[in-house]
Amino acid sequence: MMIRIGFGYDVHPLVEGRKLIIGGVEIPFTKGLLGHSDADVLYHAIADAFLGSLALGDIGQLFPDNDERYRGIDSGLLLQEVYRRVRERGYCLNNLDAVIVAQKPKLLPFIQKMRENLAVLLNTAIENISVKATTTEGLGFAGREEGIAAYAVITVKEVLENG
């Protein structure tokens, strides 16, 4: 059985007048993430990790920010399309480990719901999904509350025809 690894990263600036959506969860906060879609930084990092695992490019190539079809789109739909392409090539998720980097808001109360959302979107057991959050101890753009970043590492495994 072939196992492949993918790594993804995404970042979006925090701005007033936008909803903060991370991992498909709307989080009460005074600012939201700016982007062409709903700017779900976690879903974007995971999508890039999936694409990287099979050398399929990145989400910017697949869903360009100058394409009006994707303006304001739910990033869960983008992630589902990416995962459909992974499955189409004979692979499925083995394990996902992600970390969100944000000084504020505190994300711990929302992590379990993010994991549940991902388990449903990716049709896998929640035990295969790890999501964590951390701060930068006040350092850098995240520490200054200018933006939020996410990193994701995944392994995908080849789906065997008879087993």
Curated annotation (Swiss-Prot):
Signal peptide: none annotated. GO terms for biological process: isopentenyl diphosphate biosynthetic process, methylerythritol 4-phosphate pathway; terpenoid biosynthetic process. Binds 1 divalent metal cation per subunit. InterPro entries: MECDP_synthase (IPR003526), MECDP_synthase_CS (IPR020555), MECDP_synthase_sf (IPR036571). Pathway: Isoprenoid biosynthesis; isopentenyl diphosphate biosynthesis via DXP pathway; isopentenyl diphosphate from 1-deoxy-D-xylulose 5-phosphate: step 4/6. A divalent metal cation binds at residues 10, 12, 44. Its EC number is 4.6.1.12. Involved in the biosynthesis of isopentenyl diphosphate (IPP) and dimethylallyl diphosphate (DMAPP), two major building blocks of isoprenoid compounds. Catalyzes the conversion of 4-diphosphocytidyl-2-C-methyl-D-erythritol 2-phosphate (CDP-ME2P) to 2-C-methyl-D-erythritol 2,4-cyclodiphosphate (ME-CPP) with a corresponding release of cytidine 5-monophosphate (CMP). Belongs to the IspF family. This is 2-C-methyl-D-erythritol 2,4-cyclodiphosphate synthase. The gene is ispF.
